[in-house]
């Protein structure tokens, strides 16, 4: 592995983090907040990292998948470490809690260890939202978009940070495609901010929640999340943009080029829409029949929590008090997540479709061994290699949930709570049930559990394979050529 090239890219990433940290620094200085010293030190540390990496780095165009994977993995390690510095240096959180909050933000999980946000400076709250926004599209994807040129490494970096199976052939024009996705991401953020302001929310709060919404994180500037606003238009628009953020941004780009009918012809998006509508109807009916909830209120909280817990993690109602059936539907949505190419995590709707179609193909071939079943996704043939990757990912996803839940239960969590927390952290959702319900935080968990969940959140965001590759001895051998 060419460690010098990896260091060179990490140096540029560190300088980019310094530039990002400078934004809340300006807010802290203008607002005369006590956090300005913490942000100033964070900027200096980021610059120091950039200089240190640059000292032992050099650019190169001769890169392999191994360098791309290393850059992605260590890029996330570096980004989350530098991102935790304002919390740590400002004495708002201890080391592990600061790291947890940073990873939670960048991975779009939205799980917080702040006991309360009252008294926390706006610059710190804004930085939490920035981590959600940067990590939503992807630290590496945004970094690629801001690079003045593209090369072989960008393809490997993009693949390593990928967000689900896709049949789009974007690699030959990867840099152009990434810039386009970044522009769409910006446009969505601006539109969301403007609409939130029309709903009566102040600009600073509207911008913060827009970044968290489009980044599908769920961080809020208030302890009671979106329940704080008691604003129906705000909730409905938030639900709409959470739903859109759970869709494929590359699909939106194609719709811009070829027309909106592309979206409706996409099998994954249609399935995603169907899942959201079906889950909303089931939960609303369950709330009406089991709790006697008013129909309009049941529909309101159902549509919000369905779109939220399949992507983001905002809270508009205490779903801990809901019937078991509704909780199980929400838990299933956490597992599924959003679409491939979205800012949401989970197993992705595309994988769910392929798993179901592959199972159907196996059943048909059992009935007729000579039958050849062609598996497609939106009209494109899916080969055996991709089906194998999808099946392997699904197995590993369930394995991570099982291991995480086992370790949490060993640390004292109730079995159902442990499973729910494992699902919500690997799915990068945030709120779960029990000890970390809609109205709770992750602060009561032990350091052991928090450390486990830090790793689980990263595994979920990087889709397991990238981090598992680091455990392969051949990855670190100088003589091994990938």
Model-derived regions, located:
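Membrane-proximal intracellular helices of multi-pass ion channels
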Residues: 1-482
């Amino acid at each position: 592995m060419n460690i010098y090239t990896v260091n060179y890219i990490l140096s540029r990433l560190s300088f980019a983090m310094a530039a990002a940290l400078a934004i809340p620094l300006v807010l802290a200085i203008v607002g005369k907040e006590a956090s300005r010293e913490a942000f100033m030190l964070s900027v200096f540390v980021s610059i120091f990292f950039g200089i240190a990496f640059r000292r032992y780095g050099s650019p190169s165009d001769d890169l392999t998948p191994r360098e791309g994977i290393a850059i992605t993995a260590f890029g996330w390690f570096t980004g989350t470490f530098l991102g935790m510095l304002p919390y740590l240096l400002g004495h708002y959180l201890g080391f592990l809690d600061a790291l947890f909050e940073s990873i939670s933000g960048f991975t779009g999980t939205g799980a917080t260890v702040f006991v309360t946000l009252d008294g926390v400076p706006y610059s710190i709250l804004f930085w939490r939202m920035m981590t959600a926004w940067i990590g939503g599209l992807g630290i590496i994807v945004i970094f690629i978009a801001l690079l003045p040129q593209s090369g072989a490494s960008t393809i490997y970096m993009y693949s390593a940070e990928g967000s689900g199976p896709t049949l789009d052939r974007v690699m030959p024009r990867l840099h152009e495609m990434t810039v386009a996705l970044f522009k769409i991401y910006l446009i969505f953020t601006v539109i969301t901010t403007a609409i939130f302001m029309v709903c009566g929310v102040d600009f600073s709060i509207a911008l913060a929640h827009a970044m968290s919404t489009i980044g599908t994180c769920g961080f809020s500037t208030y302890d009671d999340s979106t329940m704080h606003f008691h604003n129906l238009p705000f909730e409905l628009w938030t639900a709409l943009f959470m739903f859109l953020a759970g869709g494929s941004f590359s699909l939106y780009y194609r719709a811009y080029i070829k027309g909106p009918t592309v979206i409706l012809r996409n099998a994954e998006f249609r399935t995603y829409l169907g899942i959201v509508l079906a889950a909303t109807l089931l939960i609303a009916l369950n709330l009406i029949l089991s709790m006697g909830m008013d129909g309009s209120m049941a529909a309101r909280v159902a549509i919000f929590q369905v779109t939220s817990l399949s992507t983001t993690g905002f809270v508009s109602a205490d779903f801990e008090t809901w019937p078991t059936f509704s909780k199980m539907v929400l838990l299933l949505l956490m597992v599924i997540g959003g679409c491939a190419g979205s800012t949401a995590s989970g197993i992705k709707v595309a994988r769910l479709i392929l798993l179901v179609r592959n199972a159907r193909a196996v059943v048909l071939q059992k009935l007729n061994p000579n039958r050849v079943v062609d598996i497609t996704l939106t009209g494109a043939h899916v080969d055996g290699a991709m089906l194998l990757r999808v099946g392997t990912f699904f197995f590993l996803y369930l394995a991570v949930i099982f291991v995480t839940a086992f370790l949490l239960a060993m640390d004292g969590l109730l079995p159902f709570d442990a499973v729910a927390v494992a699902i919500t952290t690997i799915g990068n959702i945030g709120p779960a049930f029990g000890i970390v319900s809609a109205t709770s935080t992750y602060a009561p968990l032990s350091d052991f559990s928090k450390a486990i969940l830090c790793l689980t959140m990263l595994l979920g965001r990087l889709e397991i394979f990238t981090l598992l590759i680091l455990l392969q001895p051949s990855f670190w051998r100088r003589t091994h050529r990938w």
